[in-house]
């Protein structure tokens, strides 16, 4: 099964959770913060403007993005947890 986001929605795979604190303490699953970074897997066609034009998204598949801790909706696809969020919920694109 594959998912194709609609309009200005973006499908993101969250980075792996940190299992150790900065001081080297192993964190249990409930205490580990969910990362606010991830890889864009797929994007919608774009945002429909008031005059009916379609504005393409600024992010593309393969981009690494930073988003808010509570951004998006979690979906499970073939056993993998992914996030679907609006492009507006993305705070930045990580550039190397």
UniProtKB/Swiss-Prot annotation:
Keywords attached to this entry: Chaperone, Cytoplasm
SMART domains: Cpn10
Major subcellular site: cytoplasm
A Gene Ontology biological process term: chaperone cofactor-dependent protein refolding
Compartments it resides in: Cytoplasm
Entry keyword annotation includes Phosphoprotein: no
GO molecular function (one): protein folding chaperone
InterPro entries on file: Chaperonin_GroES (IPR020818), Chaperonin_GroES_sf (IPR037124), Chaprnonin_Cpn10_CS (IPR018369), GroES-like_sf (IPR011032)
CDD domains documented for this protein: cpn10
Any one Gene Ontology cellular component term annotated for this protein: cytoplasm
HAMAP family noted in UniProt: CH10
Quaternary assembly: Heptamer of 7 subunits arranged in a ring. Interacts with the chaperonin GroEL.
Family in the record: Belongs to the GroES chaperonin family.
PANTHER family (alphabetical): 10 KDA HEAT SHOCK PROTEIN, CO-CHAPERONIN GROES
NCBIfam families on file: PRK00364.1-1, PRK00364.1-2, PRK00364.2-2, PRK00364.2-4
Function: Together with the chaperonin GroEL, plays an essential role in assisting protein folding. The GroEL-GroES system forms a nano-cage that allows encapsulation of the non-native substrate proteins and provides a physical environment optimized to promote and accelerate protein folding. GroES binds to the apical surface of the GroEL ring, thereby capping the opening of the GroEL channel.
Protein name: Co-chaperonin GroES
Gene giving rise to this polypeptide: groES
